[in-house]
Amino acid sequence: MSGELKRGLEGVLVAESKLSFIDGDAGQLVYCGYDIEDLARDASYEEVLYLLWHGALPTGEELDAFSDELAAHRDLDDGVLDVARELAEQDESPMAALRTLVSAMSAYDESADFEDVTDREVNLEKAKRITAKMPSVLAAYARFRRGDDYVEPDESLNHAANFLYMLNGEEPNEVLAETFDMALVLHADHGLNASTFSAMVTSSTLSDLYSAVTSAIGTLSGSLHGGANANVMRMLKDVDDSDMDPTEWVKDALDRGERVAGFGHRVYNVKDPRAKILGAKSEALGEAAGDMKWYEMSVAIEEYIGEEKGLAPNVDFYSASTYYQMGIPIDLYTPIFAVSRAGGWIAHVLEQYEDNRLIRPRARYTGEKDLDFTPVDER
């Protein structure tokens, strides 16, 4: 076997997609032809889901019908709730719990074992159920582990507001609901990242949609992919607890050889466009609360890292302070990433099914050859 070895598959083209376009030099992200700044400002998460799954923005009538269908699928079967309670009692990590619960959801989906896993209409219905129920299982698990009861979904609320309602037991105000909806839009898709590629590899074997999403959640749980926003917030809290100037704290961390979370990206060579939008939201939340500490600390660190390391923040950097100011527990940040990205994972799986080919790369063998076998009693 010959050819250039591409570790990490960096820069390797393995598929064609109409879903998202990234210009790493210009700092641009596009979903199905629409710039992320426009979508974050004007579109709901439901509109973005429809766009990713159908390739076009919905009409008002289509959006109403689509949103109603999603809302109708939010409630959970008793068996799934029982699993969530058990995981909470065992103090399972949120990402492991979400992975297990999504897999458990398939046991209560009559179409989960539908013979033709590539049937688009069946998969679209399945996609609605998965996407509608993922926020519900996460909220249920989070409430169970703190000793609270399950809050049934409210079909009058949109996708974002309903999650916050099911998590906290009270309807969020307009600012929090709109901020969370925008965060879901920003995280909905991002090309062939590791978790998306994992979902595509799984679906390329003609495994089902639940298996693909479960694979993606497992991949996102790794520290090199998901989890950076939680690490950013833990860092900000450490800085706050130290009473040090943020730049001095970061300088000391760098001198110790530590990595500062939330900076740099495999694709962007400039500031992540999503970080720009979330930074503005973090600032607005701070102003509304009369407490600019977390935003100002983040800005100071961004400026220092930019000057000293030439690195720009990615989406995780400002999502940390945004979520924290919304009162979301830190260890739910990555599961929320999964709740949002499920729409993109599913969109890529639908594309994969439309023109499927088993994904089967090769490795360059570097081991021994022509060894003589020695029986076990002679070794």
Curated annotation (Swiss-Prot):
GO CC terms, sorted: cytosol
Enzyme Commission number(s) from the entry: 2.3.3.16
Active site residues according to the UniProt entry: H225, H265, D316
InterPro entries named in the record: 2-MeCitrate/Citrate_synth_II, Cit_synth_Halo_CitZ, Citrate_synth-like_lrg_a-sub, Citrate_synth-like_sm_a-sub, Citrate_synthase, Citrate_synthase_bac-typ, Citrate_synthase_sf
Metabolic or biological pathway: Carbohydrate metabolism; tricarboxylic acid cycle; isocitrate from oxaloacetate: step 1/2
Keyword Acyltransferase: yes
A biological process from GO: carbohydrate metabolic process
Organism superkingdom: Archaea
Catalytic activity: oxaloacetate + acetyl-CoA + H2O = citrate + CoA + H(+)
Listed GO MF terms: citrate (Si)-synthase activity
Keyword field: Acyltransferase, Allosteric enzyme, Transferase, Tricarboxylic acid cycle
Additional note from the record: When expressed in E.coli, CitZ is produced in a soluble but inactive form that can be reactivated by incubating with 2 M KCl. Citrate synthase is found in nearly all cells capable of oxidative metabolism.
Subunit structure comment from the entry: Homodimer.
Protein purpose: Might regulate the synthesis and function of enzymes involved in later enzymatic steps of Krebs cycle.
Protein family: Belongs to the citrate synthase family.
Protein's UniProt name: Citrate synthase
